[in-house]
């Protein structure tokens, strides 16, 4: 069931034996009215750093159960003086979470740090209220100050080891992958929790970045099938929307990252709900 303010709760009755042996992060949960059953990725994630009981385990379990990840900039939430309209930003985030979004990442290199921190002061507690995750991009200092759940980097940013040195063991770490070699490296890299494959289609949010098509999602899915023990969560990203979602799903993707499909929607909650309906439970 979904508790007050959208918080994730266990779904259905649990046998005493199952309840005794399964940490909360490993039990079936409902998010926005949809059930997530535990899978090997979630079970593996739940015990990585702290025996399946601490904040890192809970975050990784939530990431493994995630299907819909939204990246947003802050431009449309800025007032004329450059400060953040926190109420408008909060309304957007809450609508997205109600629609079934699992992760919201703030990604805007054009704003001051003070604006980013103001956004995270809204996002971090709101994500927690909804049983979802907050994410930062590129700047580990901002991520540390904001106390986000997830930190995402590109291929030329901080290494995983550097991120861990700055952020500690409990923050979920992700990376963007644009080639088959990068996908293979991400699957094997110690300390990296998830990766993204793309951009599948060209997108104005990443100008100059050539589209890679469905080749990388197909590769990631094939590698998971061949080596389930080496699997970790991955998301298809780049130009994904409701119309293209069936193609991404056919390539083997079970998780997606979207930008405009939700951020530019007239009704972000409805847009998120439509996307979530096309993804697995």
Predicted regions and their residues:
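Glycine-rich phosphate-binding active-site loops on the catalytic face of alpha/beta enzymes
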Residues: 155-162, 196-208, 245-275
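Glycine-rich anion-binding loop/nest that anchors nucleotide
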Residues: 196, 234-240, 257
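Compositionally biased, low-complexity flexible segments
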Residues: 3-23
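Position-driven detector of the extreme protein N-terminus
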Residues: 2-3, 25, 36, 44
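Conserved N-terminal beta1-alpha1 strand-loop-helix module at the mouth
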Residues: 30-150, 166-192, 219, 230-234, ...
């Amino acid at each position: 069931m979904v508790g007050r303010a959208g918080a994730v709760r266990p779904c259905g009755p649990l046998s005493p034996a199952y309840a005794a042996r399964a940490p909360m992060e490993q039990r079936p949960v409902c998010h926005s009215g949809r059930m997530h059953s535990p899978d090997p990725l979630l079970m593996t994630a739940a015990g990585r750093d702290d025996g399946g009981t601490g904040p890192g385990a809970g975050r990784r379990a939530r990431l493994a159960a995630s299907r819909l990840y939204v990246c947003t900039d802050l431009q449309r939430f800025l007032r004329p003086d450059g400060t953040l309209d926190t109420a408008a930003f909060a309304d957007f985030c809450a609508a997205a979470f109600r629609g079934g979004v699992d992760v919201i990442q703030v990604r805007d290199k054009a704003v001051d740090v003070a604006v980013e921190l103001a956004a995270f002061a809204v996002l971090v507690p709101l994500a927690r209220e909804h049983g979802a995750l907050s994410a930062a991009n590129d700047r580990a200092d901002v991520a540390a100050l904001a106390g986000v759940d997830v930190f995402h980097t590109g291929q030329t940013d901080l290494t995983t080891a550097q991120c861990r040195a700055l952020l500690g063991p409990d923050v979920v770490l992700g990376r963007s992958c644009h080639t088959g070699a990068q996908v293979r490296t991400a699957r094997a890299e110690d300390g990296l929790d998830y990766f993204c494959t793309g951009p599948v289609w060209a997108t104005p949010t990443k100008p100059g970045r050539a589209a890679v098509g469905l080749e990388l999602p197909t590769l990631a899915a094939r590698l998971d099938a061949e080596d389930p023990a080496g699997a970790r969560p991955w998301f298809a990203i780049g130009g994904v929307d409701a119309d293209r979602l069936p193609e991404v799903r056919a390539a083997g993707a079970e998780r997606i990252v979207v930008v405009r499909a939700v951020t530019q929607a007239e009704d972000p909650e409805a847009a998120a709900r439509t996307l979530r309906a096309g993804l697995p439970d």
